[in-house]
Amino acid sequence: MKITKIEKKKRLYLVEIDKKESLYVTEDTIVKYMLTKEKALSKDQLEDIKNFAQFSHGKNLALYFISFKQRTEKEVRDYLFKHEINPHIIPQIIDNLKKDHWIDDYKLLESLAQQNLNSGDKGAYALKQKWLQKGCEKQVIDEVLTQFDFSEVAIKVTSKLLRKYQGKLPTKSLKDKLIQNLINKGFSFQESKNAINQLELEADEENEQALLYKEIEKQYQKFSKKYDGYELKQHLTQSLFRKGYDFDAIASALREYF
């Protein structure tokens, strides 16, 4: 068999064999196998050309994908599969890219962890879950995260949350709110407690009393439609306690209110 036609098509070349079979190859394939019109090919040579063309095309696609930003190994695999690169060729492409340091999950995660340390707002658990979803190996993730201490990030996030909620909640509810928000962002319970302790929250008794009376009025409007007397006081007490107000402060305020 021989090549009867070679035609450039954007990034690829169309190679026609015996005016019957055709395939698309990269420029690297043309150069590597010195493909020219009328060149004779054996069956084995043609198979080698097809495999290398897939490899070369897949690698070019991967490099294009990586050029926009760093990618995990799984992201590159999925991208190649999506673009219909032969599944048997994909591992070769990945190995080649890793050998040339185009793909390096460890360094990528190190970079992302450092970014989070400098300007992010996530704890280690949130980062780990995100990276696992990206297909990174648990062992690699754990090795990277052991290098970083995100306690300062937790303090920064706590300070920001404090500006949002302080003065709007009693101290106990405020602390609970802060801890829940921090846990949701991937910090451990202990990291969350330590961050709050670092900021040394102080109760504003005058403000808390004002909040309590305001809440009593609100809850009274709700429960007085169904209850009165002792039952009303019980429901008010339970509701206010669940909202983080001190039991003694509730009892004192209700005595004044009634």
Curated annotation (Swiss-Prot):
Localization annotation: Cytoplasm
Keywords for this protein: Cytoplasm
Gene3D superfamilies: Winged helix-like DNA-binding domain superfamily/Winged helix DNA-binding domain
Primary localization class, coarse: cytoplasm
One BP annotation, GO: regulation of DNA repair
Family label: Belongs to the RecX family.
UniProt-listed NCBIfam families: PRK14135.1
Protein name (Swiss-Prot/TrEMBL): Regulatory protein RecX
Species assigned in the record: Streptococcus thermophilus (strain ATCC BAA-491 / LMD-9)
